[in-house]
């Protein structure tokens, strides 16, 4: 039963009264609960969550009073929200990342104007043990029915914000009411719905980790380790002194992995090693430099910083250094580092991560749960590449929190509310799944909300299907009116899942806005075809775009992904014009989609910032209108592909080019003039004629790679030679080395032989006679 809060709190001698409320209203009504929460949190070295629900001004006033009563200094408080209503640090929700890597005694999260799930995920981890996370919200009974700025971002045309369901916020409120350590105060009624007190035993002093007996790092290093996990991670880093070693550290947020990396970096620099640190942003790696500098000071060695705060380089006198470079610069291993430390590796594309495998020694540290996300790139694809490398790999897992007790209820709540710990089903439950044993299911948001295990399995698989998954993706899954979920289940457990987005069906005015360069939310495929490829009518047909698709790792290569796509097409074929997809192209993925009936209509000319690959757009038409749409875009793609491959796409993987062209599914004849055919026929007499006019050779290559008259005419290596030399115009020397020819002469002769075979396949009889004159 809610309890009534007593009347106004009077000042008590010795209390902090230094906060100023900028609303102009008095901060009254008893908030003794805050004092009790803080006291309990400090005794147990845990955090507590205080929800103040009601009128915006009143909740802000009560927040000021609560923090005063809880004896939280303004200097240790941050407000995250639209207004800086306290005399303390303030950030908008859009700038919540400013709290990453920092520690605060209290964070006040003002959710009155909007609730951004990513901002919650980024800020809750900043609260130290003994601290408070204060959430300001509208009345909880009506909050799920309200629509805010974040909800508006989920409404993509032709849907409006009124179509957003509010399921995420409803579930969010339910978790607040269900979890330990969370106090809820209705400031309008003056009642405490729940006090959040758990009566935990006092925290016991944690003994310092025992240093390893055979340590190579100096003894001062292990004296700075706070947990056994951290000690074990630091000891694993000792292997980096030897070339050919790799260390992979996976940890939840707040486990001290960056600090452990910093302790290792300090030791290595003191031992005359050049340590290169990189990460998606400097702030994610800043703790490495803080900890390395502290350790060097403990060593008593002379070293310099390139700047007094946030240093990006530490130089040890007469020894090595620790230096930072952003990933695009660090990937070339500038100045030959001895060791590379990649922080938050899961946030980097696989293509970028692979480049660090050339370092003498390397560590990859990443967050397992949390907004940073460990998605397909790191957990699946890159792990495979790492295993194939020549590096000896040491795996380290860190689970013990550094700054608060491992029984902390706020972390438990955050993991549940944001599904940061979502996982697919364990292998044993689904290892017998086959296309014949699975059930196709249409999963509504209501279905997912009603079954927590089902929601965790679905979201856990979707996390693995993408390079980076954030809490906002959970809100989209539950609330976005254009999204639907389809899955295959085996004995009730999810083995494959797809997230679909409705696109197209746009009004004339929306299509005009899009065509003229205006921003229209969602509708990625119509946007690309309309804005970039100048086809305004592309927004008329209605389609379903496959945003993500994933199959459980234990049952891959059994045809379950194809089974799911087949069921999706069968369900939607009579209701939409097309099913489509856009993704970072790899040879394997392009072949998968092509085998399932999808055809190439576009290949982006810049790499995707998330995947690091060139994105391909593919369509599977379901209606005559969509068939016409796909046909004209296939034609236009064939028209332009040779030109873009020799310029913006000249570094595209030749196997991607081969797969993308083969997936165009359009037989376009070779159209060469008589003179161009004579040029082609002359290549066997000297491949240098290719430089005279590359156009006919490109047309012939495009024809064969997209729709070969004889698919066995050329080997994969010969097709790669066509891509690299004819389509991408790489120098002979580069092609010779990449494709392992003995000499440039051999490379030229091979190309001449290839052109001869293609000429006989596609040339008229008189062309073959011309060819014979040069043999």
Swiss-Prot record:
Localization per Swiss-Prot or TrEMBL: Cytoplasm
Residues at which ATP binds: 230, 254-263, 403
Top-level taxon of origin: Archaea
Record has Signal as a keyword: no
Binding residues for acetyl-CoA: 549-551, 556-562, 588
EC number: 2.3.1.193
InterPro entries the record matches: Acyl_CoA_acyltransferase (IPR016181), GNAT_dom (IPR000182), NAT10/TcmA_helicase (IPR007807), P-loop_NTPase (IPR027417), TmcA/NAT10/Kre33 (IPR032672), TmcA_N (IPR013562), tRNA_acetyltr_TmcA (IPR024914), tRNA_Cytidine_AcTrnsfr (IPR053477)
Protein purpose: Catalyzes the formation of N(4)-acetylcytidine (ac(4)C) at the wobble position of tRNA(Met), by using acetyl-CoA as an acetyl donor and ATP (or GTP).
PANTHER family, A to Z: N-ACETYLTRANSFERASE 10, RNA CYTIDINE ACETYLTRANSFERASE
Protein name: tRNA(Met) cytidine acetyltransferase TmcA
Organism of provenance: Haloarcula marismortui (strain ATCC 43049 / DSM 3752 / JCM 8966 / VKM B-1809) (Halobacterium marismortui)
Lineage of the species this protein comes from: Archaea, Methanobacteriati, Methanobacteriota, Stenosarchaea group, Halobacteria
Gene name in the database record: tmcA
């Amino acid at each position: 039963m809610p309890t009534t809060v007593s009347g106004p709190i009077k000042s008590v001698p010795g209390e902090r009264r230094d906060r100023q409320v900028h609303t102009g209203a008095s901060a009254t009504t008893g908030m003794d609960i805050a004092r009790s929460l803080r006291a309990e949190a400090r005794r147990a070295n845990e955090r507590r969550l205080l929800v103040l629900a009601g009128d915006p001004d009143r909740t802000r006033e009560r927040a000021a009073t609560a923090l005063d009563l809880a004896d939280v200094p303004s200097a240790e408080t941050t407000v995250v929200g639209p207004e800086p209503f306290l005399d303390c640090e303030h950030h908008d929700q859009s700038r919540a990342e400013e709290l990453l890597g920092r520690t605060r005694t209290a964070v006040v999260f003002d959710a009155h104007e909007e609730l951004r799930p990513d901002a919650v995920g980024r800020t809750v981890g900043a609260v130290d043990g003994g601290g408070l996370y204060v959430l300001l919200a509208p009345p909880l009974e009506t909050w799920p029915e309200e629509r805010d700025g974040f909800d508006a971002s989920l409404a993509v045309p032709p849907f409006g914000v009124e179509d957003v369901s509010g399921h995420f916020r409803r579930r969010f409120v339910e978790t607040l009411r269900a979890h330990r350590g969370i106090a809820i105060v209705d400031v309008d009624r003056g009642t405490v719905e729940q006090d959040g007190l758990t009566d935990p035993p006092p925290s016991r002093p944690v003994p310092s980790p025992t240093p390893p007996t055979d340590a190579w790092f100096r003894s001062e290093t292990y004296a700075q380790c706070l947990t056994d996990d951290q000690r074990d991670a630091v000891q694993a880093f000792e292997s980096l002194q030897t070339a050919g070693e790799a260390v992979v550290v996976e940890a939840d947020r707040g486990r001290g992995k960056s600090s452990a990396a910093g302790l290792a970096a300090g030791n290595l620099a003191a031992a005359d090693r050049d340590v290169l640190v990189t990460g998606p942003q400097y702030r994610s790696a800043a703790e490495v430099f803080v900890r390395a500098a502290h350790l060097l000071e403990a060593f008593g060695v002379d070293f310099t910083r390139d700047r007094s705060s946030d240093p990006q380089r530490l130089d040890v006198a007469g020894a090595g250094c620790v230096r930072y470079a952003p990933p695009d610069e660090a990937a070339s291993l500038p100045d030959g580092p001895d060791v590379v430390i990649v922080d938050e590796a899961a946030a980097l594309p696989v293509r970028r991560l692979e480049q660090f495998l050339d370092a003498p020694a390397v560590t990859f540290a990443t967050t397992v749960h949390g907004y940073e996300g460990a998605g397909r790139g790191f957990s699946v694809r890159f792990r495979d590449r790492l295993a194939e490398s020549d590096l000896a790999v040491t795996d380290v897992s860190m689970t013990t929190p550094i700054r608060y007790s491992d029984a902390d209820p706020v972390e438990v709540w955050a993991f549940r509310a944001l599904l940061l710990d979502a996982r697919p089903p364990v292998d044993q439950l689904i290892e017998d799944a086959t296309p014949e044993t699975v059930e196709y299911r249409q999963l509504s948001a209501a279905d997912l909300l009603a079954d927590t295990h089902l929601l965790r399995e679905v979201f856990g698989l979707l996390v693995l299907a993408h390079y980076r998954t954030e809490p906002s993706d959970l809100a989209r899954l539950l609330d976005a009116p254009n999204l639907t979920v389809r899955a295959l289940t085996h004995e009730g457990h999810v083995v494959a899942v797809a997230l679909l987005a409705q696109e197209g069906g746009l009004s004339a005015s929306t299509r005009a806005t899009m065509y003229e360069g205006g921003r229209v939310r969602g509708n990625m495929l119509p946007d690309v075809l309309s804005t970039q490829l100048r086809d305004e009518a592309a927004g008329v047909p209605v389609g379903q775009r496959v945003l993500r698709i994933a199959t459980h790792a234990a049952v891959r290569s059994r045809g379950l992904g194809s089974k799911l796509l087949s069921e999706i097409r069968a369900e939607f074929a009579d209701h939409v014009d097309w099913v489509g997809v856009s993704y970072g192209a790899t040879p394997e993925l392009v072949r998968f989609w092509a085998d399932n009936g999808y055809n190439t209509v576009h290949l982006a000319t810049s790499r995707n910032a998330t995947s690091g690959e060139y994105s391909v757009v593919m369509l599977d038409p379901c209606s005559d209108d969509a068939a016409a749409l796909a046909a004209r875009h296939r034609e236009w793609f064939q028209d332009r592909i040779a030109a873009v491959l020799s310029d913006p796409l000249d570094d595209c993987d030749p196997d991607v080019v081969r797969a993308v062209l083969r997936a165009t599914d359009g037989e376009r004849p070779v159209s060469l003039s008589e003179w161009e055919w004579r040029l082609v026929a002359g290549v066997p007499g000297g491949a240098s004629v290719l430089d005279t006019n590359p156009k006919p050779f490109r047309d012939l290559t495009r024809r064969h790679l997209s729709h070969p008259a004889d698919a066995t005419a050329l080997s994969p290596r010969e097709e790669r030679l066509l891509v690299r030399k004819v389509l991408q115009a790489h120098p002979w020397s580069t092609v010779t080395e990449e494709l392992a020819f003995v000499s440039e002469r051999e490379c030229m002769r091979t190309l001449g032989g290839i052109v001869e075979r293609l000429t006989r396949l596609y040339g008229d009889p008189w062309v073959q006679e011309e060819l014979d004159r040069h043999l």
